[in-house]
């Protein structure tokens, strides 16, 4: 799809590699080539009973994208102070923060987003946050309701509220 439409794409998935499973994020350039594969480093993504084949990645890194130095932190990765310090050492221009959270629209839009903005403010770069959205279960309270934001210096610079369909276009 990236190549067909000449469009860069970044997406999360459960990766299987050599008998191990990882919570991963892959980024493709407009030509459809893999330009990054990041594996979540924090342990919170798996069920407590998961076996040793469910693993975390080995660390953070950056990759070039559209003239910027990009780093990725998946879901819970940015809630560990040691991870914040490691990301800041990399000195990225932008950090992508894709997550899966199941806050209600009002929980996210009224309170939780402020906590995320504060946490993102510990990173010395703008943070692009995006939550998954589940369109097939509108009555289910325990599913991702979407939402996206540009966090910078502890503030919300731009946002697409949870529960709203749309596109958030930002420059950073």
Feature map (PLM): residue ranges:
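CN hydrolase (nitrilase-like) catalytic-core segments centered on the catalytic cysteine
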Residues: 1-10, 79-167
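A cross-domain feature marking catalytic cores of carbohydrate-active enzymes
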Residues: 13, 74, 131
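Active-site catalytic loop in hydrolytic enzyme cores
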Residues: 16-90, 104-114, 118, 171-172
């Amino acid at each position: 799809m990236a190549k067909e439409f000449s469009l860069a794409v970044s997406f999360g998935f459960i990766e299987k590699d050599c008998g191990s499973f990882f919570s991963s994020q892959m980024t493709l350039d407009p030509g459809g080539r893999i330009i990054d594969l990041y594996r979540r480093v924090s342990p919170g993504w798996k069920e407590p009973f998961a076996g040793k084949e469910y693993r975390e990645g080995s660390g953070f890194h950056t990759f070039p994208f559209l003239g910027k130095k990009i780093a990725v932190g998946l879901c819970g990765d940015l809630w560990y102070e040691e991870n914040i310090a490691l990301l800041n050492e990399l000195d990225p221009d932008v950090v992508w923060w894709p997550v899966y959270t199941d806050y209600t629209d009002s929980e996210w839009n009224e309170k939780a987003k402020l906590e995320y903005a504060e946490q993102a403010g510990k990173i010395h770069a703008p943070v692009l946050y995006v939550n998954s959205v589940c369109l097939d279960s509108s009555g289910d309270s325990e599913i991702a309701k979407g939402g996206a934001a540009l966090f910078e210096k502890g503030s919300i610079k731009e946002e697409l509220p949870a529960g709203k369909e749309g596109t958030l276009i930002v420059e950073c």
